[in-house]
A protein has these predicted regions:
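Extended alpha-helical scaffold/tether regions of large eukaryotic proteins
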Residues: 1-326
Length: 326
């Protein structure tokens, strides 16, 4: 333990060394070590410096392309993943999303949420009956109803994870969103101001794409479903569609620019409301008062300590005591 303490003391006295160790550790995918270095950064007061350094390197390397900056394999996103995997981050997401996930999993059949006419199951015509224009109109009506359902679900999800900018939830910054997430959003906001980046695009890439969207695409891996609830392959399609819709909002792109069947959603009133809502509310994520920000870093440090203790292997005596209690 003394050797480990001496190592950390040596690390925290040099910000440049800390960044170097982060860079090397994140590439090697050593999660526990990355978490320990993250703790060293927060305990020494250098966490902001480390994240800003990684952000600036990505901005320079990829010429301010926000979508590339937050690519899945970047060092920046691996740093962020350390904070996204903390218990408070996972708990917050479950509290906000679980009810909406269950609605999607249990209330509707897959064909009631399908948006692609090619994938929409055709209703069989009676023997000897030829489907005419009226039949095609019926299919169009089903698609319109499906778009209404999916737009409504997306609208509820967006409001759950991102309150309106004027919402009372924002009045107490210590209670909406946990400290690791809000702290990261503030640092991203600061980097965007420094480098004149598209703030909502980068914040949306972090918060909506890296944090919220994986739970929509794979809810069973994020503790969103009760043990007795399962998702069939056909139902999985509905979750994928919802995650694609949220991705469009996060990237601020026109619906239908990638997949033509999404184009009618661009004119849907609820989708347009979601676009305005996301654009305004994402900026609120990064607006953290200095006194509130000062309270966050000790909270993050404490949670990293507890998380590391949970990752640590038990000593033989501890294991025997645990077995005896059981």
């Amino acid at each position: 333990m003394k050797d480990w303490e001496q190592f950390l003391q040596g690390v925290v006295t040099r910000k440049d060394v800390l960044v170097f160790l982060f860079r090397d550790t994140l590439r090697s995918k050593q999660d526990a070590v990355a978490k320990a270095l993250c703790l060293a950064a927060f305990s020494s007061g250098h966490a902001g410096f480390v994240l800003q350094t990684l952000l600036e390197e990505e901005v320079t390397r990829f010429e301010q392309d926000c979508n590339v900056i937050l690519r899945g394999t970047s060092l920046l996103t691996k740093w962020m993943d350390v904070l996204l995997q903390l218990p408070s981050s996972r708990t917050f997401l479950v509290e906000r999303l679980r009810r909406h996930i269950h609605v999607l999993a249990s209330r509707y059949r897959a064909d009631e949420l399908e948006l692609d006419p090619v994938r929409l199951p055709q209703r069989a015509a009676p023997p000897g009956v030829v489907v005419d224009a009226a039949g095609e109109m019926e299919e169009d009506g089903r698609l319109a109803e499906n778009r209404d359902r999916m737009a409504s679900i997306l609208h509820e999800v967006v409001k759950a994870v991102l309150p309106a900018a004027e919402s009372p939830e924002w009045q107490d910054d210590k209670h909406f969103l946990n400290a690791p997430l809000r702290w990261t959003c503030k640092e991203i906001f600061q980097c965007c101001e420094t480098h004149h980046l598209h703030t909502s695009a980068l914040l949306g890439g972090f918060y909506l794409l890296r944090y919220v969207n994986p739970a929509l695409a794979m809810p069973e891996k994020h503790n969103m479903l009760d043990p007795d609830v399962s998702i069939s392959p056909s139902d999985r399609r509905s979750f994928i569609l919802l995650s694609k819709m949220l991705q469009n909002l996060a990237n601020d792109v026109v619906f239908g620019s990638k997949e033509a069947f999404m184009a009618p959603l661009q004119e849907h009133p609820l989708i347009q409301e979601c676009q305005r809502h996301v654009s305004q509310s994402l900026l609120r994520l990064g607006a953290v008062e200095p006194d509130v920000l000062a309270l966050m870093e000790p909270q993050i440090e404490e949670e990293l300590v507890l998380s590391l203790l949970g990752d640590a292997p038990q000593e033989e005596g501890d294991r025997q005591e645990s077995v005896a209690r059981d």
